[in-house]
Amino acid sequence: MRLSILILSLLFLILPAKAQPKHEVRAAWITAVYGLDWPRTRATTPQGIRKQKEELVDILDKLKAANFNTVLFQTRTRGDVLYPSSIEPFNSILTGKSGGNPGYDPLAFAIEECHKRGMECHAWMVTIPLGNRKHVASLGNRSVTKRMKDICVPYKNEYFLNPGHPGTKEYLMKLVREVVSGYDVDGVHFDYLRYPENAPLFPDKYDFRRYNKGRTLDQWRRDNISEIVRYIYKGVKAMK
């Protein structure tokens, strides 16, 4: 055992420098859902706004001290966002009310504070899930389920964007374009870009019959996810 450890140690020592990564990503998520990481204070008063900002700064200071260099800041949750958007409403975690304006731009603030500390800030966006019926109802007429019913489907008491509908990739690209064009983000991080777990009865039969082009259901669904990634990647690269 000692000999093996010694040999491994020597191998690491003689590996060429070029084998080392040029940039090691040491990333952490800052989760806004239910205020799991942030925020704990509601931004309903000047004092509340200041406290909410201080909470985020404290997290960033701790990450910097722990030698992290990348922050994945939750920018979209489930059909709502943490920046002033012309497409979707503010998440209720900021003020206690869906669509409530916190009086500042959380994403812009997060980017500025990350860059002050020499850290990258990536926009972390939950993509396909839209939340349960209660959550969707709380968003009112600004919910995508009300504005663009064709690309949304209910499944097991929740709503989802339909990956098999061509309009879904267009809608997600619109959101990503809003973020990439309006903010100095260092990257975009997609979450839940997939079908729900154990979803043999996911209601996409109509789209499958229309768009499958001879593929099996499983292959068609896999291709739908790949196409969304491909489409948005190309769109972002065309911008930056």
Predicted regions and their residues:
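Catalytic domains of carbohydrate-active enzymes, especially glycoside hydrolases
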Residues: 51-80, 182-185
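Aromatic- and glycine-enriched glycan-recognition loops and surfaces
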Residues: 45-66, 93-117, 223-234
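Aromatic-lined carbohydrate-binding/catalytic grooves of carbohydrate-active enzymes
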Residues: 66-102
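Active-site-adjacent "subsite" loops/lids of carbohydrate-active enzymes
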Residues: 23, 31-54, 112, 122-182
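Boundary at the C-terminal end of the N-terminal hydrophobic targeting segment
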Residues: 17-21
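Bacterial N-terminal signal peptides
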Residues: 4-13
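Polysaccharide-binding and catalytic clefts of secreted carbohydrate-active enzymes
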Residues: 68-69, 105-108, 117, 140-240
